[in-house]
C-alpha cells in the first residue's frame, strides 16, 4: 500500500514556492516545527534576506527529520551547519 503524499512549502507559502513531497505523518511533524518559528515566517512581503533565512530554516528542518528517521548523523551535521546562516539572516532584519 502506498503512502499518501502531501506538498510541503519548505519556507511557508509567503517566502518561497519550493515544495517537497512528504508522507502525511512527516508533513504534520514538519509543520508542527514550522509553527514554532519566528512569527515573521507567516508575513507577506518579507525581504529577500528574511525569505532566504526561512528557506535555510526549512531545509534544516527537513535534514533533522531525515536524521531522526535514518539515524544517519550526516544529516544532523548538515542541519547544524545551517544554523549560522539562519541566525544571520533572521537577526539582520
Where are these regions (language model features)?
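The canonical Cys-X-X-Cys-His
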Residues: 26
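Short flanking/linker segments adjacent to small metal-binding domains or redox-active Cys/His motifs
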Residues: 59-93
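Charged, amphipathic alpha-helical linkers/stalks
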Residues: 34-69
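Histidine-centered nuclease catalytic patch
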Residues: 1-22, 30-42
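Generic serine detector
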Residues: 16, 21, 52, 81, ...
Amino acid at each position: 500500500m502506498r503512502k499518501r503524499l502531501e506538498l510541503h512549502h519548505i519556507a511557508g507559502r509567503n517566502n518561497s514556492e519550493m515544495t517537497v513531497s512528504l508522507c502525511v505523518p512527516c508533513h504534520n511533524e514538519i509543520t508542527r516545527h514550522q509553527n514554532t518559528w519566528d512569527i515573521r515566517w507567516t508575513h507577506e512581503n518579507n525581504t529577500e534576506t528574511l525569505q532566504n533565512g526561512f528557506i535555510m530554516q526549512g531545509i534544516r528542518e527537513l535534514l533533522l527529520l531525515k536524521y531522526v528517521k535514518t539515524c544517519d548523523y550526516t544529516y544532523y551535521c548538515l542541519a547544524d551547519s545551517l544554523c549560522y546562516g539562519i541566525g544571520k539572516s533572521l537577526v539582520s532584519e
